[in-house]
């Protein structure tokens, strides 16, 4: 196990940047990567949660932790982050997402624009900016968090789901483009996860297939370097197969609406 951790640190270190780090899956990624000895750049909006997370990580692990509290939907702030960062970043984890809930006719256009900014524009920019050094060094990795909502149309979260489909397709294409350059790209196509956001919005807190964040992170890190996508949890893999391969599209969309109609 120790040699695997050392190999992971050598391949994806010395620094990892985690966008959307403050809680849930992002915090679980932070803990798992700290256990593997990577120094961390933590990015999220809420400074108090970031500071609390960083304090705990420093106390439990012999690593460096840098915090940046900023809005990942603000491209000026994101550009400033990249230009001011001089650490050797070997791994990018993009976990941040904006997901307003509501039928398209009821969602303000400003919210739709923010979905594009946070879920598409910023990860594109960060991948482009950070992968150049990874390619030059001949090693590195990118993890994009995606969602089962993006494998078919998802009423009530239609634009968010479309952005997650984009994330998956981008990761798959980049996986092929960059694998021979020793840069590993992976999309985690997750189902329901017990994050603070999910527990607030979901009507059914323990739906079949719901996972804890650390379970999602463990399966994702295990898949990095061996596959373009991973769907944590056997139930979720089965559901993905049924929804994407067996059911007619209209039926899959109706089933998805049954799952999303009670979101708040």
Predicted regions located by residue number:
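C-terminal helical subdomain
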Residues: 187, 203-241
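Residue(s) in the substrate-gating loop at a strand-loop-helix junction
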Residues: 147
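Conserved glycine-rich cofactor-binding loop
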Residues: 15, 20-23
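Conserved NAD(P)H cofactor-binding loop of Rossmann-fold oxidoreductase domains
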Residues: 95-100
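Conserved glycine-rich Rossmann-like NAD(P)H-binding loop of the short-chain dehydrogenase/reductase
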Residues: 36-53
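Substrate-binding pocket helix/loop in short-chain dehydrogenase/reductase
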Residues: 103-104, 108-116
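Active-site helix of classical SDR
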Residues: 127, 163
